[in-house]
Amino acid sequence: FVKDGVTLTIEAGTEILGRYDANYSADNPAPCLVVEQGGKVMAQGTADAPITFRSELSEDDPNYGNGRGLWGGLIINGYAPIANEGGTAAVEGLTGVLYGGSDPDDNSGVLRYVRVWNGGSSIAPDNEINGITLAGVGRGTTVEYCEVALNLDDGFEMFGGTVDLKYCSAVSVGDDAFDTDAGYQGRGQFLLVVRADDSDKGHEMDSKTNGDLDSQPRSHPHFANVTVISSVAHGEDALRLREGTGGDFRNYIIHGANDGVRNDDNGSEVVTQDLAEAAAAGHPDFLYVSGSMVMNGLGGDPWDDFDEATDGTWTGTYVMESAGLSYTVDANGLPATLDVTPSADGSAYEGVDDVIEDDFFVPTYYKGAFGSANWLEGWSYLDEAGLLFEQEEAVTLLGGNLTEDTYLAASGTYYLNQQLFVKDGVTLTIEAGTEILG
């Protein structure tokens, strides 16, 4: 337990092993790292030297099994607002550890290039530990280039708070990949979900507190550039929105799965695919899902039992054309091969949504979590396990606003997939012999 006023600093490249016990319970709790309110963790790894939390067991140990639930996880608690009377609540998986407050800018530290594998031990029926739990964590906290793989319960779960996530992945977790609840109002961009055949949903997003579908603050995640990959044999919805959650979802690619997006148990929020209508409803009382969302390779319904019974105008628009991703599973339903980078001539580069203009979101010219570059390379579980498709030749995609001096070498491969604007004061230099494809 990192107590109030204490900072735990973890050096890049550090590996922390979790003790294994086949009989974890409430009386024999699984080991986990808990940052209490007012404490901080400074875990700043790099792509070449990530910080890794994993089980002490190796894959050839007879107790390793499918690699899930072998120890606890990482639990961070902050003072940011949550939807609960009194402003605080006890965190899931522990006894008597509180989260929540009134400071949306609360700072619990830094998680950068942090990998959490093999966690999620069950300590009681329906009481498991998530890979990374962010409970009442504020936006002053940095969470980027983080990964949860082979967790028994959820990958990332946010209970209220305002913390933002960028460049994060959840791989082969037993429950939901990104789970939000209790008034979470953070932002996320460049998020990847890779579901094994027995994983649950890519997102499960709730808001209801004490039976009230309109409890405040209403959960209202703003997520953009998200890729959710699974096989068509997967029986669960890719995204599940329910219990009064609002939100803003743009530039998504859903590849595979049975059904796409399900929404039920609305509160009084407006459900719409029209940004003007969402703006008129006002934050956080709308649920906006972009009509440019790519849903390809589904076995069932793109909008599964989608509840649109509000004052909003719901059109059920989506894009069916392939983004050029590929994914196979092995005999156990676990990832075997994976190509997360979309085709330059596919649907990922057509009808791209503008992201919200603020200090967090990065303007992109593609949908999904990846353009031509793969930010998983060099540090992810998927890369280390040899599951990522190796590109023979990197393609640089050109489009949007060029805001800094740029040099295009003749040795590169370039694809102009939209208008490219060289802005005032910027110089674009193109080497002799360069070929740019349109």
Q: Where are these predicted regions, by residue range?
A:
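Catalytic domains of riboflavin
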Residues: 13
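Extracellular beta-rich repeat passengers
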Residues: 1-3, 19-40, 44-46, 50-153, ...
